[in-house]
Design a protein with these regions (language model features):
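Substrate-binding strand-loop-helix patch
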Residues: 13, 19, 58, 145-152, ...
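Catalytic cores of nucleotide-enabled group-transfer and carboxylate-activating enzymes in metabolic
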Residues: 11-18, 22-24, 93, 100, ...
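Conserved acidic residues
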Residues: 34, 46, 77
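Conserved catalytic core of Hanks-type protein kinase domains
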Residues: 30, 39, 161-162
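A short C-terminal helix-loop "cap" of Rossmann-like NAD(P)-dependent dehydrogenase/epimerase domains
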Residues: 7-9, 100-102, 127-134, 159-171
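Catalytic helix-loop patch of NAD(P)-dependent Rossmann-fold dehydrogenases
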Residues: 50-68, 72, 77-78, 87-143, ...
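N-terminal Rossmann/SDR dinucleotide-binding element
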Residues: 1-35
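Conserved NAD(P)H cofactor-binding loop of Rossmann-fold oxidoreductase domains
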Residues: 39-43, 83-85
Length: 180
């Protein structure tokens, strides 16, 4: 999306694999960030069933790698881990969930993002509090960013349909989010 928006020359972007700790360390050394926004993920629920190992490597160990880089950074002051609204134990009740509800996730994607939050919480208590690094987590419904053209993602699917002047298909019109 950087190219489509015409901002690829205005934003410093490093493309890499979150599972590669050494590359992440180099990226942190180059960027020397003060604020880290962690949105990297294997975000496709259907793909998590096809390749759960890759999903956990990316979403859990990738978070460990980011946390390690934050922990060893001399410049980071604030860290945000963005997960998903799918982290909650689905109790099939009629009312919305609160942030302090029990974590779970029935499928590999949702569970891996719950694990990502647990990793972050462990790093807060084990390292970040003592280092004075402010840490937050956010549970997003839909996240979109540069290069996000994956199938089975509502926003990219709607954009593709609109560009082609096709009907926008709502796959499950009765679906609700756990906070609704």
């Amino acid at each position: 999306l950087f190219e489509i928006a015409g901002i690829e020359n205005d934003i410093h972007s490093i493309i890499g694999d979150i599972r590669d700790l050494e590359s992440l360390k180099k990226a942190f050394d180059v960027a020397q960030p003060e604020i880290v926004l962690h949105l990297a993920a294997q975000p496709i629920v259907r793909d998590s069933y096809k390749n759960p190992v890759y999903t956990y490597e990316t979403n859990v160990m990738g978070t460990v790698n980011i946390c390690e880089c934050v922990r060893h950074s001399k410049t980071v002051k604030s860290f945000l881990n963005v997960t998903t609204d799918k982290v909650y134990l689905n109790k099939e009740w009629a009312w919305g969930y609160r942030e302090n509800e029990e974590l779970d996730g029935y499928d590999p994607y949702s569970n891996s993002k719950s694990c990502s939050e647990l990793v972050t919480h462990s790093y807060i208590n084990s390292f970040f509090n003592d280092l004075g690094i402010s840490v937050s987590t956010a549970r997003a419904g839909n996240v979109i960013g540069g290069g996000d053209f994956a199938n089975d993602r509502i926003i990219p699917d709607c954009i593709r349909a609109a560009v082609k002047h096709e009907d926008i298909v709502v796959r499950n019109p009765f679906s609700t989010r756990p906070y609704q």
